[in-house]
Amino acid sequence: VEGGRLRGAVTRADLLRHTYQDLLKRPTFPAAGERELGEPVARNVAALLANRLPPRIQSLLRSAGTVGDEVGTKVYAVGGFVRDLLLRQENLDVDLVVEGDGIAFAEALGRRLEANVTSHRTFGTAILTLPDGFKMDVATARTEYYEYPAALPTVEHSSIKMDLYRRDFTINTLAVCLNADRYGELLDFFGGQQDLRDKTLRIIHNLSFVEDPTRILRAARFEVRFGFHLGRHAEQLAMNAVQMGLLEKVAGIRLTTELQLILQEARPFAILQRLDQLGVLAAIHPRLTLGSDMEQRFQRVGEVLTWYGLLYQEPSAASWIVYLLTLFGELRGAESRAILRRLNPPPRIATKVNWDLARLRALARQFQQARELPHSRVYRWLVDASLESILALMARMEQPEVRKAIGDFLTTRRQVRPILRGNDLQALGIRPGPIYRDILNSLLYARLDGHVQSRDDELRFVRRRFAKVLPVGEDGGEMSTGDRRARKSEG
């Protein structure tokens, strides 16, 4: 303000640029400049929608467009759904963005589809759950700004163009209109199609990694998943953001979310290796490192998870936990706990990981020191361990006989039960009590080791091993059921 008149304005972006001007100094890379915002590249992908999507998904998209026309709003499919459509990769996670009242649109679409609608009015978002369990996300077109680097965003309603502008990479800024008069029209404001063809990950503006440093982790994930590469300029900005300590300001739970997504990918080690190159792992915690044999360990985990998946057994394993146990497995307890404190996962996850790591380390020592591995011993060691820790152990152990013993436990031994039950022991005249547990466990171990096979074998085993708790007749023999009834009637 000068002389009572407004001469200009300083925006949030101006302040961030001034604060982080060193980070934003652009290296002189040829042909690496960013494209200017402009009108979208014209293209219609209705035929691609028809050829690539199941009829049911096409019907849902058509219904969304029809409802949009009825309530007077423009409706778009956006994000990874559109990106993967153009890449000819299957992705049925439908995300819709509405220019207007997204909640009102979601409720109207929910009525048409007989879907349950869960709304979050603060953010202008909703989740539609169809009767068969299929889900669609609906969001009001919005823009975001960040009060400070690495902060959570503040949200305001906006246009589809500004909604796409807030996204991480140009390949995720593509949108397809679903309204009847424009069905299949592809919006590409930021050159996302060209970047898909060039296999390049490009940020939309220079402050992208300042606003949200977790985008660096997503960049590595997308690089490996799609075989893409960060543009040289974007890579330099990512490394600058790491060196300036911006990741240290990110809430741990957000890092946990990104790490979980990474460990659920097909090639998690390659992503971690890329993050290590960018300095991200050390920025999260100095002890978060990749040992010389970690790649081989991750490869074995992948093989073990594939093997277990082919068994079609319940329960299923949380694969990312198995990889996390492997990543932390060689650390001391205090070190892994320190990293978990930085990541700050939900308490249930933190407790599980700490417990599983302790069990994994103890089991590894036991198996390494064991000279013999009878099935009963393996059962006693593993029966109380989580599935994830057992699979991590199987991948960790190199001795074939140990891996086979663990595999036998998972495939058959853990389901073994003795034939006799408590009522059978009672029929033998054994008084109910803690002794039942001892007897049944002994029977189980004997069956696991092949010492008993039939019901008669188990009866003989009990009479021989637990003779002291069996009632005896006056001749020193075991009492029959008739003898016990007679004695009871005499009493």
Residue spans for each PLM region:
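Catalytic cores of the polymerase beta-like nucleotidyltransferase superfamily
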Residues: 1-491
